[in-house]
Swiss-Prot record:
Record localization: Cytoplasm
Protein name: Putative pre-16S rRNA nuclease
Naturally occurring in which organism (per UniProt): Thermus thermophilus (strain ATCC 27634 / DSM 579 / HB8)
Entry's Gene Ontology cellular component terms: cytosol
HAMAP family reported for this sequence: Nuclease_YqgF (MF_00651)
Function: Could be a nuclease involved in processing of the 5'-end of pre-16S rRNA.
Family, per entry: Belongs to the YqgF nuclease family.
CDD domains: YqgF (cd16964)
Length: 135
């Protein structure tokens, strides 16, 4: 089954896709956040376009494993997607942005400065972690 991943931030949503059974993911860019309904419509289009059976959405947790303040901004999007029939699985996204920054460390400066590229790569890291666990 094809699986997508979302790294949901304040301004952008990083996108990635992969295949269950294969621990590699590919970035698919990012969406600039608008209203909740516009975000949901854009993500439904992403799900259809990529032929996804499931979305893995990063859940921002604190180091003590409790939901962070940002989680309260992610959950309404998750519930809206579920209400539209999308299978969504929440996944611990702690350190995904740090790992994405590490991957970008030796990239050209224009890529390192592109915050959207960082969001996309964070979604890739998130999905690769999910796929590597074979769930």
């Amino acid at each position: 089954m094809r699986v997508g991943a979302l790294d949901v931030g304040e301004a952008r949503i990083g996108l990635a896709v992969g295949e269950e059974g294969v621990p590699l993911a590919s970035g698919r860019g990012y969406l600039v956040r608008k209203t909740l309904e516009e975000d949901v419509e854009a993500l439904l289009d992403f799900v259809r376009r990529e032929g996804l059976g499931k979305l893995v959405v990063g859940l921002p947790l604190r180091t003590d494993l409790k939901e962070s303040a940002q989680a309260g901004k992610v959950l309404p999007l998750v519930e809206a997607l579920r209400a539209r029939g999308v299978e969504v699985e929440l996944w611990d996204e702690r350190f995904t942005t740090k790992l994405a920054q590490e991957r970008l460390k030796h990239a050209p400066k224009r890529l390192r400065r592109d915050k959207g590229k960082l969001d996309e790569l964070a979604a890739v890291v998130l999905l690769e972690d999910y796929l590597a666990r074979g769930i």
